[in-house]
Amino acid sequence: MDTMGRHIITELWECNPDKLNDIDYIERLFVDAALRSGAEVREVAFHKFAPHGVSGVVIISESHLTIHSFPEHGYASVDVFTCGDRIDPATASQYIAEGLDAKVREDVKLERGMGPIRVPEAQVAISK
């Protein structure tokens, strides 16, 4: 495959529910994750749901970072997609997992581009 980008789908469990429900914290965390990975932030949009949960996106020149949080379950669904090979999406994904105090993390790493997607086995990290 002619790789045009790398995509990490991250499942985070046993996260800090207060952090998962704090829109300001999550927005700062995601912008910081993008910047720490070397990305250039273009747009930021986050929404707080009632009674709980946050969804948001950080658009970067190289693609995007997204989250959907479920504080009532201690769970967050995170995507980090970067075009090219200058930015390492794993840097941002790791920073986000640590920032949400995730005790269990599962990643699926995909190469995106011109050709069929090959889906590898998920990699699970438990930090109990």
Swiss-Prot record:
Any one of the GO BP annotations: spermidine biosynthetic process
The reaction(s) this protein catalyses: S-adenosyl-L-methionine + H(+) = S-adenosyl 3-(methylsulfanyl)propylamine + CO2
> What InterPro entries does the annotation carry?
AdoMetDC_C (IPR042286), AdoMetDC_fam_prok (IPR003826), AdoMetDC_N (IPR042284), S-AdoMet_deCO2ase_core (IPR016067), S-AdoMet_deCOase_pro-enz (IPR017716)
Q: Which GO terms describe its molecular function?
A: adenosylmethionine decarboxylase activity
Which residues in this protein are found as Pyruvic acid (Ser)? 63
Q: What is its EC number?
A: 4.1.1.50
Q: Name one Pfam family in it.
A: AdoMet_dc
Q: Where is this site: Cleavage (non-hydrolytic)?
A: 62-63
**How is this protein organized at the quaternary level?**
Heterotetramer of two alpha and two beta chains arranged as a dimer of alpha/beta heterodimers.
| Cited function | Catalyzes the decarboxylation of S-adenosylmethionine to S-adenosylmethioninamine (dcAdoMet), the propylamine donor required for the synthesis of the polyamines spermine and spermidine from the diamine putrescine.
Q: Which family does it belong to?
A: Belongs to the prokaryotic AdoMetDC family. Type 1 subfamily.
Question: What is the protein name stated in its UniProt record?
Answer: S-adenosylmethionine decarboxylase proenzyme
Organism annotation: Exiguobacterium sp. (strain ATCC BAA-1283 / AT1b)
